[in-house]
Amino acid sequence: MSEQFQHVSVLLHESIDGLAIKPDGIYIDGTFGRGGHSRQILSQLGENGRLYSIDRDPQAIAEAKTITDPKFTIIHGPFSGLKQYVEELDLVGKIDGVLLDLGVSSPQLDDAERGFSFMKDGPLDMRMDPTSGIPVSQWLQEADVEDITWVIREFGEDKHAWRIAKGIVAYLENEENEPLTRTSQLAKLISEVAPKSFKEKKHPATRAFQAFRIYINSELDEIDTALKGALDVLAPEGRLSVISFHSLEDRMVKHFIRKESKGPQVPHGLPLTEEQIKALGSAKMKPVGKAIKPTKNEVNENVRSRSSVLRIAERL
């Protein structure tokens, strides 16, 4: 890995411990990133164990190809395709554990050319896979104020969404302005139009940048599909270990595990026979322990871990 863009895996040991690795098990790392979790899983596998890792970032794929362990296979694609990949491998119901480390990796944030960070000047892109989809700069050119407001409010949970969206559209409609193509331009613009608040510790552009990244990569849809796919491919007693980095992600994971742990909810008094109730199915998984957050030591060593949450569940 390039020394310039190092990545420290968050909740590394806790998430791997949550998988309860079997030496001869079959595992999926849905988010290879720079391989921290994958390498840890591989170190615990015996000769007959297998690890299939997934990533849609070409730089992550290049890093994965440096691993020569015959137990390891890298798959280039979004983790929402997890179920499809496992079906093609004819391993549905045979997977002993699935790990999902959500969010943006440190090398992606640190590489200005990827356009994820308002702290660094770079192209206003934000695509996880630069070979598909459109960059944020193009989307902003084509979107109206209502669309931009909705994205910032829905995915950034920013109460100033309307004001920020109006400022962006006003800038773009002024022909005297330079094209909005750089992260530094957008960060400066948001800082100028967002109301000044002494209570807000974060940079004014934090939530909007998060919102645009989530939207342009369809991240929440990807997570929803991946969670459902993981449930479908896991073997009985197989583990699901998910690390999230903001409240939108964590709520999705929490609600998914809760829903699948309860099974179908039958309204009280509904006239169903015992056979009909059984036909509705039962709980498909159970939570393992409580949500885990990083220790103070980990946060001190890696400040980006401070918002992370790990949730673990087991297939029934």
Swiss-Prot record:
It is an enzyme of class 2 (transferase). Signal peptide: none annotated. S-adenosyl-L-methionine binds at G35, G36, H37, D55, F79, D101, Q108. Its EC number is 2.1.1.199. It is found in: Cytoplasm. Pfam families: Methyltransf_5. InterPro entries: RsmH, SAM-dep_MeTrfase_MraW_recog, SAM-dependent_MTases_sf. Its main location: cytoplasm. GO terms for cellular component: cytoplasm. The keyword S-adenosyl-L-methionine applies. Keywords: Cytoplasm, Methyltransferase, rRNA processing, S-adenosyl-L-methionine, Transferase. The keyword Cell cycle does not apply. It catalyses: cytidine(1402) in 16S rRNA + S-adenosyl-L-methionine = N(4)-methylcytidine(1402) in 16S rRNA + S-adenosyl-L-homocysteine + H(+). Transmembrane segments: none annotated. GO terms for molecular function: rRNA (cytosine-N4-)-methyltransferase activity. One of its GO terms (biological process) is rRNA base methylation. SUPFAM superfamilies: Putative methyltransferase TM0872, insert domain (SSF81799), S-adenosyl-L-methionine-dependent methyltransferases (SSF53335). Belongs to the methyltransferase superfamily. RsmH family. NCBIfam families: 16S rRNA (cytosine(1402)-N(4))-methyltransferase RsmH. Specifically methylates the N4 position of cytidine in position 1402 (C1402) of 16S rRNA. This is Ribosomal RNA small subunit methyltransferase H. It comes from Aliivibrio fischeri (strain ATCC 700601 / ES114) (Vibrio fischeri).
